[in-house]
Amino acid sequence: MADATSTPSIDFSKIQSVIEAPDLLKVQLDSFHNFIQDSVPLAKRREQGLEKVLRSAFPITDTRGLYLLEYISYSFDKPKYTVEDCIERGLTYDVSLKVKLKLSYKDEADETDWKETIQQEVYLGRIPYMTERGTFIVNGAERVVVAQLHRSPGVVFSEAVHPNGKKMYSAKIVPTRGSWIEFQTDINNQIFVYIDQKKNFLVTALLRAIGFTRDEDILGLFDLVEEVPMKAAKRERLVGQYLASDIVDMQTGEVVSARTAITEEVFEQIQAAGYKSVKIMKSFNGSDKGQDKSIVINTILNDSSATEEEALEIVYEELRANEAPDIDAARSFLERTFFNQKKYDLGEVGRYRIGKKLSREFSEMDEYLGGKGELKQLSDTIHQKILQTIQSFSDEPIGEEVLVLTHLDIIAVINYLIKLVNGQAEVDDVDHLANRRVRSVGEQLAAQFVIGLARMGKNVREKLNSRDSDKIAPADLINARTVSSVVSSFFATSQLSQFMDQTNPLAEMTNKRRVSALGPGGLTRERAGFEVRDVHYTHYGRLCPIETPEGPNIGLISSLSVYAEINDKGFIQTPYRVVEKGHVTDTVVMLSAEDEENKITVPVSIPIDANNNIAVESVQARTKGDYPLVPSEDVNYMDVSPVQIVSAAAALIPFLEHDDGNRALMGANMQRQAVPLLVSEAPVVGTGMEAKVARDSRSVILGEGPGFVEEVTSEFIKVRYDIDTENNEHMSLLDPDEGLKTYRMIKFKRSNQDTCISQRPIVKNGQKVDKGTVLADSSSTEDGELALGKNVLVAFMPWRGYNFEDAIILSERLVYDDVFTSIHVHEFEANVRDTKRGEEQFTRDIYNVSDEALRNLDENGIVRIGAEVKERDILVGKITPKGESDPTPEEKLLRAIFGDKSSDVKDASMHVPAGMKGIVIKTKLFSRKKKVGMDVKEKLELIDARFERREIELRKSFEKWLRQMLQGKKVKGLTSDKGKVLADEGAAFDDALLAKFSSQPFLESIDFTLGVTGTKKVDEAVIRLVKEFRFKLKDLADERDNEKYKVNVGDELPPGIEELAKVYIAQKRKIQVGDKMAGRHGNKGVVGKILPIEDMPFMADGTPVDIVLNPLGVPSRMNIGQLYETSLGWAAKKLGVKFKTPIFNGATYEEVQAELERAGLPMHGKVRLYDGRTGEQFDDEVTVGYIYMLKLSHLVDDKIHARSTGPYSLITQQPLGGKAQFGGQRFGEMEVWALEAYGAANILREMLTVKSDDVVGRNKTYEAIVKGQNLPEPGIPESFNVLIRELQGLGLEIRIDDRVP
């Protein structure tokens, strides 16, 4: 057992973080629990997540208006099986969702009152439930739902340049659900509208269609109407202008329509009509100040519509590609597209983004319309009309936020476009994190429920429409499979539901904190350009600039930074300290990218005096993407920690500040691939993040409060916690063991990547513990710190060319002492199905198999635990029926004599695959059939008796604590929820009264809101105790029902499987040539040679080094951090301490030198080494020290294989490739050249014929080998026949002349 006393640690950090980093799994856990709100009482549930989805899906009515199905509330049952049971049986860890619905009906649609209502709890399916580790178990596999970074709903302004050099601007309104609408300027100075990227039409037609029917109204919206007096002096001013409104001669009835250019003749007509003034369109020329709004006038002048009807027809025709049947149809089509909340939804985020972006336009418009009485009235009328439209489509009253598009949004967008044309506004940056938001697991699940409930709603309506009888209940209408099938397919097939990377705790945690731009509704690898992949200045403190994959997904998959959190709108926030006039306050605020825009922030490293004032007059700050020098008084915010910028994996790299970004990226990624070793060892040079990652990944077991260790073994730890009746938070008062909690160790559990997860206690009997004390280590931790590799003595020097090109030379000591030995656990599964020909069977009685092969099988045909198995050994004996033909008379006679035993069965046993050997560490057998042995009735009676005893103990414990709390107290008010007095005020809590409390009816009837004793503290403790008692009673009942269910039905298995056998084989893999190793700085390599200890270079005192790295791997890679680590690691080993050097806040060059000097080592970190082979001293001094090396999960055992014969491709008839297909090694064009160069004609012919695609030749060769004959002449390869056919296809007649000359 590990010693609890850990190595002393020295921290080099100069700056302390102001706040503690949040729980690294908070992103997953909070998102899911906010979605289901399982711990929130029904009355306090907020309208979010599942509650919001269910409310939006109901009520459902039929077309006749006779039925109304309403939603009331939902609830969950507890999971039927534990997480471990689900993994073993291949089941899904889920809970059943039950929804309380109310169905009302009446005889006639025009009746006001409903005749009758039926309220019922309906089963709506099972949904996967998140484990404490932030994962889901789906069909026995642990999966993670990755958060998606996608374009935020709202409005986005962009620009493009036409080939003629003119800038064109566009505004795109992106809803959460519904049609996209885009406003675009063109080279002719007009504004067009595109809906769903279909045909375009002028924006004035859209404004006219929604209610601004006259030109004058549209022009008035943009202050483009000018009223000019009709005086002779104004003739020159008016001629050449355009009319803004119609001019009607009352006497003649003649009309001069709006948009008419005023000529001398028109001017005379207007004068003759007796008009004192005329409304014209404002003109713009270069000398005018302010905005040039001529784009609106141009658009109106080119608009072919003049009335609302014409505009509606244009909109309908362009979008539907046919004529509208009538105006009402066209109008309802437009209303459906943008003003129906069921069809079009901006979402809260979309409305928030539009409000933020166009706030100035909205306020300017409001101010402007306020002074225009008639126009204001028209605008209000249209607004009311839109609200009525929403209300008519949704059966609920309008909320505070209008989540559909309104005419005000369209006008504000046009105004912003006008500002863009005039150069008075800026376009948006689509890669800015204000325009991108995160869809976490909760939101993704909500989207699936919306789809499922929409389908269910359609089915319910169909059923209601076809029902004439009033005898119908909600349960008759709901089909649970409709919803659960959508959710199940999401978890099983979605690109964002991933098989969890479980190589080590860091890999597991990084997978949960990953943010992907891919997936449904996101980007694709092919479409994503350089800009979207690049690091953006808004990523600071939000997304890690280092950790991202190296392949085609680079920049599309990122990791959240250590302090980053996601707000309720899905935007990533990071914490900052508020700075006021140069004074750094202790106030910490969370800012999104939008909140931070235009603010001035400074790093945490700037000098601060004792009074928390910035100690210098000017500082280099950050604002937008620039780094200007600003006065201290202008600073708004300051970082909270130097680690804030990077993710957890990057924060684990010591001296990160000395590494090139590309190599740091590799270092962060390769730590995730480190295989847990036989004996874990924490780094002697760390960053201080190791403990945080180990704890938050949930791989270690932590204490839950003050107490002491009562018993500890390798299998479990028992801790007795102190019980505080008044401030009890961490421990149950009603625990029958009175504060004793047992923690079971995970032993040799297989991870998703076949690595081994195993826990071991690090506390001793009688040891005091507190909240957060590490009780047990995992296979990748030491003393509660992440331990992925080993501290080994390294020398940077070439050694006889064996470490050429990043190859690594190891000492044999690392093999003998199992320094880099790892355990890998492989799972093998066999199942029994009921086939058409009969049932399969697990058995050790297999025909034609030797006793030697069956020696390790038990009576069920399962291999015994502890057996050492190798390739082709039987793991599970299984027979399956053959397809039977009509039996012969002899067979009939045999069957009559011996029964059915002699019927044909074939051996379908499961064998150890090629290249595998190990020891069987665990076997499991599950059967759908009820367990034989003890009678089912007897088992059920035993369960009842056991749970009855537990209930009696629970009641005794409850009475004991209640007596302790209330003994000697007086009754203040003990009344029932119906107002009945249960005990007189002032009466003492005697034994008789206390005994009543444990009876269920009495307890349920008490109204605790009125108090019990009148003492607040006592009353709160009593209420907490009563709540816990009720909860535990229900828990007991559920647990009893669950156990009875399991006895009645046997083991639950996936559909179609009658029996399931699992065998786990453990392999011990030592480090060997071909294994990949790496440090934490991107310094990776493959083991090239393992030398005897005596051949390794050694120091003056005779100490041989463990590992030799090539010094040429350092300068060009620019990861100098490894040299700092090497020297400081040597000092740490000599001094017997551990160093913590946090990134951007760690040990300096001088401090490293000082520690080397303190350890009595050379300050430059170099010493003379001696050649192990000759004993001679090397010419130059060599950099020596301790570096933390990892063994990566790219092991040569998993990659190398050899093929004798095997499968061939059906198309080319050439051998397949790859280990999984038992394929061959590719012999390509350049390899052919190599053989040609050596003149190896026979080998070359063999390679290109019988070993490749000479089908006839290889069969003859096989036959010759079997018979021991000489090899025949090879035939014609299939690829030559393909060539002939291709040439024939080109019209060249080619025949093979196989006559021997």
UniProtKB/Swiss-Prot annotation:
It catalyses: RNA(n) + a ribonucleoside 5'-triphosphate = RNA(n+1) + diphosphate. One of its GO terms (biological process) is DNA-templated transcription. It comes from the Bacteria. One of its GO terms (molecular function) is ribonucleoside binding. Pfam families: RNA_pol_Rpb2_1, RNA_pol_Rpb2_2, RNA_pol_Rpb2_3, RNA_pol_Rpb2_45, RNA_pol_Rpb2_6, RNA_pol_Rpb2_7. Keywords: DNA-directed RNA polymerase, Nucleotidyltransferase, Transcription, Transferase. Gene3D superfamilies: 2.40.50.100, 2.40.50.150, 3.90.1100.10, DNA-directed RNA polymerase, beta subunit, external 1 domain, DNA-directed RNA polymerase, subunit 2, domain 6, RNA polymerase alpha subunit dimerisation domain, RNA polymerase Rpb2, domain 2. GO terms for cellular component: DNA-directed RNA polymerase complex. NCBIfam families: PRK00405.1, rpoB. The RNAP catalytic core consists of 2 alpha, 1 beta, 1 beta' and 1 omega subunit. When a sigma factor is associated with the core the holoenzyme is formed, which can initiate transcription. This is DNA-directed RNA polymerase subunit beta. The gene is rpoB.
